[in-house]
Curated annotation (Swiss-Prot):
This is Glycine--tRNA ligase alpha subunit. CDD domains: GlyRS_alpha_core (cd00733). It catalyses: tRNA(Gly) + glycine + ATP = glycyl-tRNA(Gly) + AMP + diphosphate. Belongs to the class-II aminoacyl-tRNA synthetase family. Tetramer of two alpha and two beta subunits. Coiled coil: none annotated. It is found in: Cytoplasm. GO terms for biological process: glycyl-tRNA aminoacylation. It is an enzyme of class 6 (ligase). It comes from the Bacteria. Pfam families: tRNA-synt_2e (PF02091). GO terms for molecular function: ATP binding; catalytic activity, acting on a protein; glycine-tRNA ligase activity; transferase activity. The gene is glyQ.
Length: 297
């Protein structure tokens, strides 16, 4: 099964579980969790089931396209179910079956790995899912989002697409993966991997990036003053990515690092609080949609 078919299979499976299928969010981010589809929508009481592929940029992991397993950008398939269904683990195992992986024929383990994202003020109970000794998925029950208590609890399933595809295709080098017939992962991503790595480690202008961080930070606050949560959160993501570029460049000292993470976290918490307030003003409209569905049933 090639990567494209794998993605289509997961999309079809989760759409049948009443998930909205969305497209990748168009701002740089380090993980699918950072998308507003997860970070903001898991706040408050409104139901939310969603699935999407998220390209995730980790500048420090760039290896010029020469390392078989380390990438500047990898891909996650993200699933959020809010509130978490009681059978969420079985739903996940069924998704593996849809991919041709029979849990009864493989060693599948849920290894405790509680999750935390300090820069977003998020935390939860979690497990790594290991398939025959390789981690393929992170499974998390959100307890805190943007510093706010998660109520109801959302379940997050994050598949590492490259790792899962490497297992399914039995490839040791990610660049050898078949994306679709006639095109490998390397055909598509080797050049951007090299160029982004070169930019990150050799070309990026640290002084300019420091200025950008401060500019994005101010603009996030300015948007929040106007109760514009989504534009503000876009600038939080830009702050986070800019910080990651500076960190990868070695431009931030150990003592400065904590301060910069704190600044991003402070903005994320402001966005979380403002998102809740704005949805509350609207009367949590998706909650009403759910109630209407129950009445029709």
């Amino acid at each position: 099964m090639n990567v494209q078919t794998m993605i289509l299979t997961l999309q079809e499976y989760w759409s049948k579980q009443n998930c909205i299928l969305l497209q990748a969010y168009d701002t740089e981010k380090g993980a699918g969790t950072m998308s507003p589809y997860t970070m903001l929508r898991t706040i408050g009481p409104e139901p939310w089931n969603v699935a999407y592929v998220e390209p995730s940029r980790r500048p420090a992991d760039g290896r010029y396209g020469e390392n078989p397993n380390r990438l500047y950008q990898h891909h996650q398939f993200q699933v959020i179910m809010k509130p978490s269904p009681t059978n969420i683990q079985e739903l996940y195992l069924d998704s593996l079956r849809a991919l041709g992986i029979n849990p009864l024929e493989h060693d599948i383990r849920f290894v405790e790995d509680n999750w935390e994202n300090p820069s977003l003020g998020c935390a939860g109970l979690g497990w790594e899912v290991w398939l025959d000794g390789m981690e393929i998925t992170q499974f998390t029950y959100f307890q805190q989002v943007g510093g706010l208590e998660a109520n109801p609890v959302s379940a997050e399933i994050t598949y590492g697409l490259e790792r899962l595809a490497s297992y399914i295709q039995d490839k040791e080098n990610v660049f050898d993966l078949e994306w679709v017939e006639g095109f490998t992962y390397g055909d598509i991503f080797t050049q951007p991997e090299y160029e982004h790595s070169k930019y990150t480690f050799e070309v990026s202008d640290s002084a300019m990036l420091f200025e950008l961080f401060s500019t994005y930070e101010k603009e996030a606050d300015r948007a929040l003053e106007e109760n514009l949560v989504f534009p503000a959160y876009d600038y939080v993501l830009k702050c986070s990515h800019t910080f990651n570029l500076l960190d990868a460049r070695g431009a931030i000292s150990v003592t400065e690092r904590t301060g910069y993470i704190g600044r991003v976290r402070n903005l994320a918490r402001k966005c979380a609080k403002k998102y809740y307030e704005e949805r509350e003003k609207l009367g949590f409209p998706m909650l009403k949609n759910k109630e209407a569905d129950h009445e029709q049933a």
